[in-house]
Amino acid sequence: MQKLGFPAMKSLDKPRSLSGSANMYSFSNRKPPDSVSSGSFSNLKLTAEKLVKDQAAMRTDLELANCKLKKSMEHVYALEEKLQNAFNENAKLRVRKKEDEKLWRGLESKFSSTKTLCDQLTETLQHLASQVQDAEKDKGFFETKFSTSSEAIDSLNQQMRDMSLRLDAAKEEITSRDKELEELKLEKQQKEMFYQTERCGTASLIEKKDAVITKLEASAAERKLNIENLNSQLEKVHLELTTKEDEVKDLVSIQEKLEKEKTSVQLSADNCFEKLVSSEQEVKKLDELVQYLVAELTELDKKNLTFKEKFDKLSGLYDTHIMLLQKDRDLALDRAQRSFDNLQGELFRVAATKEALESAGNELNEKIVELQNDKESLISQLSGLRCSTSQTIDKLESEAKGLVSKHADAESAISQLKEEMETLLESVKTSEDKKQELSLKLSSLEMESKEKCEKLQADAQRQVEELETLQKESESHQLQADLLAKEVNQLQTVIEEKGHVILQCNENEKQLNQQIIKDKELLATAETKLAEAKKQYDLMLESKQLELSRHLKELSQRNDQAINEIRRKYDVEKHEIINSEKDKVEKIIKDLSNKFDKELSDCKEESKRQLLTIQEEHSSLILSLREEHESKELNLKAKYDQELRQSQIQAENELKERITALKSEHDAQLKAFKCQYEDDCKKLQEELDLQRKKEERQRALVQLQWKVMSDNPPEEQEVNSNKNYSISKDSRLGGSKRSEHIRVRSDNDNVQDSPFVKAKETPVSKILKKAQNVNAGSVLSIPNPKHHSKVTHREYEVETNNGRVTKRRKTRNTTMFEEPQRRRTRATPKLTPQSIAKGTGMTSHARSANIGDLFSEGSLNPYADDPYAFD
């Protein structure tokens, strides 16, 4: 109740108890009927009945108020449980938030690493795509070259086919010529045989053949022409040699083209190096992005600090709200104390004179109305406080809902990030698969290009060999054709000169032999030159082919080495970049964790210092309040002692005067009141019996209620009202006095916080009873102030356990202690009119049927032992 902002509940109980005790005091302080000369017993009876009715009405009001208090307490306990649950949920949400922040940071680090990896993979893919494009360009270039080479090969094949056709035609001609030569040889043999036969007859025919010499000279001219034809054929051979030299030059040009291709490959390698430089620049850009992410992380840390500051402000506002509630509670208590002090002063003033009793009764009624108004105002304050607490609870619930929604948003964001991570991983896997496919395609293209180059080289070698064989065969055929032509010409000349050259045959034969020798020497020299030229050409072709093959192999090896080196460098740089970025991220994470740990330790130290300062201030305030309270209590005690002394002196004087007046009147009135008194006593005894039965039933119900409300029922703190009332026979002698033994128990310091116990702890009724005894009794019955002591207990503690503020307020009880007296059990004899008459006649301090005494002793007070009553 006190923790949740119901500081006026205790003050509610106090005014009610005050009102009840005031009513009790108003009718218990009334003087006995012997002192009232003008009044009558019937008026007193009516007033007593009215007071009993008022007490019953007040009891019903108290029962309703207690029911309302029970409901409000249940509602308050439910609200406390809700608040505790809300605080627990807030703590859990804070822990979850911290865990989510840690997970978020880990996910952000993973996301950044995956992002960097994805960027690197995209760069590698772009690099591979550029390489693939270059390879495709090279492939197109090689395809164009292959198409040109295939066209050249096709043209060479066509030329070879034409040459083969020509060779076939030449072979056919050679076969036909061979046949003709064989025929000519046969004819020659026949002619030689015939020439040998006719050689004998040449002498006879020399003269005939002189005419043929002219023809032989013509044949010599024809032979010169044949020699010129041979020279022309030699020139043709030289032309063919020049064509072959041109082909060699073409091969040299091809070699130069290959060197140009080598330079282009080197340029591509330079381009790759430039791309590596660009990749390094992109890595620098990635470093800048990492720095930007670090800046964003610092901004998030700042936002977190602002959030913490706002939360601290909210906690400070909550503490100020609690302090205001405490101040309201203290103000209500001070107001109740002031009203209590005013009531005490008014009660002591009312007891001064008989005439002031009526005015005091009216004033008390007015004050009861004021107390009811105060009660209504306090109830309105309580309703306002309840509304404020309900609003704060609604705010806390809305904040909890907001935190839950934020937690749900964070979980959804985390799930989205996980999905994005999965998609990124899938894209990375697909990119890796594409990369592998592209690498396989590149390797297959390289293998195909190598195979095609090897095939082209083999085809070129084959074509060169075929060309060489064809050239050799053509040269051999040409030689054979030349020889055959020469032989045919010689045979023709011989056949033509047969008839003409008979005489000059020997000379001509010698000349012919010399010319044939010369021709043979020339042919031999030409053949040797051709053979040397062929050998040199073959050697040149072989050396150039070997050089070309070596050069191509070296180029391919260099290209492979350059590509491998570029790949290795790229992989090494990539690993270095990844490792450096990982190291940077780890360093940043470590720095951030260290910073957060330091900030947390600083915040904890600051909070501890603030708590210590607050505790010191609180202890100093408590000490100052205690000192002020003790000084006020001392002042009040001094005032109260003075007032008591004055009231005692006045009461003694009044009693002396009244006793002398009452002695004369009492004897006259006793006779008249005997019969009425007996009837009234019987009625009152019957009513007392009924009320005792009712009280026993109510006690049983109250005990059952206590058992239902708590497992450990509190100790009975009720005042036993079952007193044995007796009118002793010693009253006839006038020496006995009726001593009232009021036993007051001091309240324990550790009282339960239930409002029912607090309602019983109000000591106003006890003070009123003591005042009644002072007014009704003699000087001897006035309590000694030495035997009384006032004890006040008021403590206010603030305990902080793990940041939570728990507040305990011990009850403040003001009790009057009296010397303990043993309870004496007396047997109540039956009342008889004679005993009553004797008792009233003999004693100077007459004790007739005083309604105030009856109420004080509990004979007509049905609520003396009731825990919900006013005492």
Swiss-Prot record:
It comes from the Eukaryota. One of its GO terms (cellular component) is synaptonemal complex. Transmembrane segments: none annotated. Keywords: Cell cycle, Cell division, Coiled coil, Meiosis, Nucleus. Residues 729-741 have a biased composition (Basic and acidic residues). One of its GO terms (biological process) is cell division. Residues 18-40, 719-728, 831-847 have a biased composition (Polar residues). Residues 1-40, 708-741, 778-871 are annotated as: Disordered. It is found in: Nucleus. Residues 58-304, 331-608 form a coiled coil. Required for chromosome synapsis and normal fidelity of crossing over. This is Synaptonemal complex protein 1. It comes from Arabidopsis thaliana (Mouse-ear cress).
